[in-house]
Amino acid sequence: MKRSLLAATILTCIALAIAVILPAAVTVQAGNDKTANPADAALSKGALSQADLSKAEAYCVKKGGEVNDRDPYYNTNGDEQDWLRLSGWRQFCKFKSNKDGSRIYVELSTLYTEKPTLAALAYYAEVPITGSCNGNPASCYCSQLGGSDLFGGINAAGGGWVKKSDPDDIVLEACIFPDMSTIDSWGLTYHSVGIIRGKNLDNALRYKNPYGQ
């Protein structure tokens, strides 16, 4: 009798515990993002909160850049009507040189973070490009560094980050690293041989050069 009563008491306690824990777990799982598509919102903002995103935009402008919203497209080597708009979007900071008109693009969270990122480290390291690159040297160099700017692998269709109203670069080759940090492929490639495009990012990235150059 005592064992039956004890068992009933334990089962009741377990049921009450589940009732208390389960709603809390569901609430946490749902998150606080009020956008229609939380996955796209997280992808677009990178690691930045909404407040930090606003600060990053202001920081970009303060450093002489221009906030540049871009959408991912596949098949950009084809006719524009055949381009395939993919999910998500990204905000870049575009730096354009007043002297020669050259540009460099940095994804906003990569620009604004004070922590190390693979893209910033790759920029600072100036790793020499190997002699094994064929075709597009910037895309090849991006792959050499451990990033990728390829849409669907090596193919004739192509792809990139698009801003149709941009007067300089409608389609951008952005080198994205495994930590999602991003700098454009040509900016990285030119910098590897000591050529500054757009702006010297030593004076723009909040994460400072660890190599002491």
Residue spans for each PLM region:
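Positively charged n-region of N-terminal signal peptides that target proteins for export
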Residues: 1-5
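Bacterial N-terminal signal peptides
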Residues: 10-21
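Signal peptide processing junction and immediate N-terminal pro/mature segment
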Residues: 21-35
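Mitochondrial intermembrane space
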Residues: 31-213
